[in-house]
């Protein structure tokens, strides 16, 4: 079980919850802090102090005083009116990640919600009930208002959920399971929707998939090196230590490990003096991707454990401060950086595909075809890879440089962080398919060279990958092969071998 403390949630924890079904609990210290902050809110209400979000309107209506008798209606109206998301629903993993992250933020004790609110989130997580949350509509400040409102709808018995693969009304799901919806009290509606948990949830899923794919990309590149009889000297440790980037040094070391014992790779001068950049510069380019992933990971870890509500309560409610922790700029920048890095991983992989299929660049059969001319082989696979690379270049345009004022210009600068995160996830999906295409072509190339001469590590990859996509002996519908290989990679195909 992962115990939320509001301070110690890790990416490994998120992976365990989202992909392995590990349950979630709450530490006793968090329970104490939640209850203390709630008492502070109730005292504010009792004393009649005017505090934003507790007894005022929202956004441009922040100067409108709300009567105590209207508090519950205020919170309900906030959720209903802000649930304006459009587009397709987020995946179950992202929906669940949003709940985990929101529960963890509320567990810090700065938001003033009742313990029942956090417990309801944990119940949904642990019973695998996934709010149906539209993916479009967030400006990334004040946080992810629209998507988080769709999450909050479920807590009050409204909206829709997915349960056991079926989409249904929240009311019918709760009735089936005997769950009582909440009636939100002072500040709780705002506390649920004012934060960066949508962009961070998408970012977490994008990062986890990107990290796995970065390792797999090295494995596939190693097979390509054998298929093209690449020059191993370029991975010599001395070259990379001379530059000094640790990530580059690490990639070179993994490439040496993967290719150890290969009789297909060559030495410089044996067949040619040097390779093209897409082979020779694997450590430099892939290493730079790892540098970017390190930056993204650091920012996600901070945001996963951040208080992003507004206002925040300090000193047992003596200080209630309106700030801007809901502004998604740090995650927006990180996601834009992830877009760039993963787009580059796709760029260099596609160039290796071109070298595998272009008869002017190798001595393999044209387009790896078993009967060139009569059969086209992998010709159009390279087209698809090029198309995905081009799409990624468009998606990698930074979302964070845009801002459109909202709420009558009260919220006059926004992050567009959720757009950046969605783009990053789409790029990762595209790059996975590019890597799948490289893998299919590399497997075919080494089969022409002779698999007996492969390195032990790459041969292990070959054997397992061939169970997914068989040898190309004649033209067939290769779309099925690409999707099968991409799904295998998504499920973790041979990522562990790169780490050994």
Swiss-Prot record:
Q: What is its EC number?
A: 4.3.1.3
Q: In which pathway does it act?
A: Amino-acid degradation; L-histidine degradation into L-glutamate; N-formimidoyl-L-glutamate from L-histidine: step 1/3
Q: Which GO terms describe its biological process?
A: L-histidine catabolic process to glutamate and formamide; L-histidine catabolic process to glutamate and formate
Q: Which residues carry this modification: 2,3-didehydroalanine (Ser)?
A: 142
Keywords assigned: Cytoplasm, Histidine metabolism, Lyase
Q: Which GO terms describe its molecular function?
A: histidine ammonia-lyase activity
Which sites are covalently linked via 5-imidazolinone (Ala-Gly)? 141-143
User: Catalytic activity annotated for this protein?
Assistant: L-histidine = trans-urocanate + NH4(+)
Q: Which GO terms describe its cellular component?
A: cytoplasm
Q: Does the keyword Manganese apply?
A: no
Q: How is it modified after translation?
A: Contains an active site 4-methylidene-imidazol-5-one (MIO), which is formed autocatalytically by cyclization and dehydration of residues Ala-Ser-Gly.
Q: Could you name the domain of life of the organism this protein comes from?
A: Bacteria
The record, for InterPro entries, names:
Aromatic_Lyase (IPR001106), Fumarase/histidase_N (IPR024083), HutH (IPR005921), L-Aspartase-like (IPR008948), Phe/His_NH3-lyase_AS (IPR022313)
Quote the subcellular location field of this record.
Cytoplasm
Tell me where the signal peptide lies.
Answer: none
Coiled coil spans: none
The similarity comment for this entry is:
Belongs to the PAL/histidase family.
NCBIfam families in the cross-refs: hutH, PRK09367.1
Query: What's the protein called, per UniProt?
Result: Histidine ammonia-lyase
Task: Please report the organism this UniProt entry assigns to the protein.
Answer: Shouchella clausii (strain KSM-K16)
